[in-house]
Design a protein with these regions (language model features):
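Second-shell loop/turn segments in exported
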Residues: 63-64, 74-82
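A contiguous strand-loop segment
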Residues: 1-71, 91-169
Length: 169
């Protein structure tokens, strides 16, 4: 990519700087007669990293209310940059920490041949992520399912998330 390039972004959303070299990937998008659906993609890259997602509607009030943020490009950034599922989960957290998340909420699952992770993201800069244990099956419905991250051997959450949850009841 030429120096100073940005990843393609929808109008009004964060234009994420492109990295110099990207990985090849397969991309599948659900489409309607009107065209593709922005957040209905599945990516699988040349290093064997797959990312899928499902919407998670917020149960209380909306998040930060700040304009912009990242949406579609989270999947693409993982496809272009992640060399493992573990790398992918850190890329996701770094991008949300830096740019914020535009939609109301989403669950992403990233996996490779060795590991799988789920991250659930709310609007703004709020998320919780867990490594899926090797002897477990992951179910990704249209709502938040990580209620006790400490029940997992490996988990991460955004700064201030626990305090905000207590404050909101």
């Amino acid at each position: 990519w030429p120096e100073g390039s940005a990843m393609p972004a929808e109008p009004g959303l964060a234009a994420i700087p492109q990295v110099e070299r990207t990985l090849g990937f397969y991309w599948s998008e659900v489409s309607t007669p009107e065209g593709g659906m922005s957040t209905s993609d599945v990516f699988y890259n040349e290093r064997g990293v797959c990312i899928v997602s499902n919407s998670c509607m917020q149960s209380r009030e909306d998040g930060s209310g700040q304009p912009g943020g990242i949406s579609y490009n989270l999947r693409r950034a993982v496809a272009e940059r992640a060399v493992s599922a573990r790398d992918a989960i850190h890329i996701l957290m770094e991008l949300v920490d830096r740019w914020g998340y535009a939609p109301s909420g989403r669950a992403y699952t990233v996996a490779d041949a060795d590991e799988a992770f789920m991250i659930q993201i709310a609007q703004g800069r709020r998320y919780v992520a867990v490594r899926v244990p090797d002897d477990c099956v992951l179910i990704m419905p249209n709502h938040y399912t990580i209620h006790d991250p400490a029940a997992f051997d490996e988990f991460w959450m955004s700064d201030g998330l626990a305090g905000e949850a207590v404050r909101r009841g």
